């Protein structure tokens, strides 16, 4: 799922359920968040060694690995742990490579995947009911479409400007951390023009050529191959 859609919260809920309903001791629950600076230079071998060190000798260990795509080769680590030890693994990630055929090859028959989305309209109403009175459905639907469904924007009553600030921060972290940094994009202004076009044409059919033609008309020409390259990076 996309950044800030609630993946980490879902992991925490599973951990709490294991402790409360299944009496799993906390010593057998291991949680790591790999977008932390603590793991910035970690290799797959180091990841494997660290997790192996934290496995419980007294029964199944439950491993919760958040934003695992930050570690190159993480899928080999997960496969090795699943093969060699008594573990139950839960992993999250923020890009489409989590669903790639390469990963499926490593983990064949050993995983179930879930796509996590932002709040549905029904979930939005449920969130809102915790801190204020819910209005007429049509009015609430307009607000939902305008403000979006990121959980962080509906944890309390925010002004429209505050919501836009939160969403802008999520956008910036997605563009700069997940796309620019990972793909070493140098011409960020070009990428943002392509992003803006796609946002403005949600629900419409478009191609790399139509984007290129539009930007050319705006005197900001980009060739088809460059546009396609940016779209490919955005998709991943």
Describe each PLM feature range.
Residues 64, 88-94, 115:
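Structural recognition of the conserved hydrophobic beta-strand(s) that form the central parallel beta-sheet
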Residues 56-74:
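Conserved P-loop NTPase "ATPase switch" module shared by AAA+ and STAND
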Residues 8:
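Walker A/P-loop
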Residues 80, 97-113, 127-129:
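Short regulatory helix/loop adjacent to the ATP-binding pocket of P-loop NTPases
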Residues 160-236:
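Accessory nucleic acid-recognition modules appended to NTPase machines
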Residues 3-4:
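Walker A (P-loop) phosphate-binding loop of P-loop NTPases
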Residues 131, 135-172, 180-181:
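Amphipathic alpha-helical "lid/sensor" segments that cap RecA-like P-loop NTPase cores
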Residues 28-61:
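Short glycine-rich substrate-engagement loop in P-loop NTPases that contacts/grips substrate
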């Amino acid at each position: 799922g996309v950044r800030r859609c609630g993946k980490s919260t879902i992991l925490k809920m599973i951990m709490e359920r294991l402790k409360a309903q299944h009496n799993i001791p906390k010593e057998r629950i291991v949680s790591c968040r790999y977008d932390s600076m603590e793991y910035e230079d970690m290799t797959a071998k180091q990841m494997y060694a660290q997790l192996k060190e934290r496995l419980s000798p007294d029964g199944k260990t439950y491993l919760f690995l958040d934003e695992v795509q930050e570690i190159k080769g993480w899928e080999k680590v997960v496969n090795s742990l699943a093969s060699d030890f008594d573990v139950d693994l839960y992993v999250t990630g923020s890009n489409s490579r989590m669903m790639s055929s390469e990963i499926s090859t490593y983990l064949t028959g050993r995983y179930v995947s879930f796509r996590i989305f932002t709040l549905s309209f029904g979930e939005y109403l449920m969130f809102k009911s915790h801190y204020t009175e819910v209005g007429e459905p049509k009015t609430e639907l307009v607000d939902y479409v305008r403000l979006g469904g990121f959980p962080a924007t509906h944890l309390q009553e925010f002004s429209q400007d505050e919501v836009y600030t939160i969403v802008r921060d999520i956008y910036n972290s997605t563009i700069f951390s997940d796309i620019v940094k990972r793909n070493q994009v140098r011409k960020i202004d070009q990428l943002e023009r392509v992003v803006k076009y796609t946002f403005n044409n949600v629900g419409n059919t478009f191609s790399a050529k139509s984007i290129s033609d539009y930007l050319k008309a705006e005197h900001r020409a980009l060739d088809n191959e460059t546009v396609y390259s940016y779209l490919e990076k955005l998709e991943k």
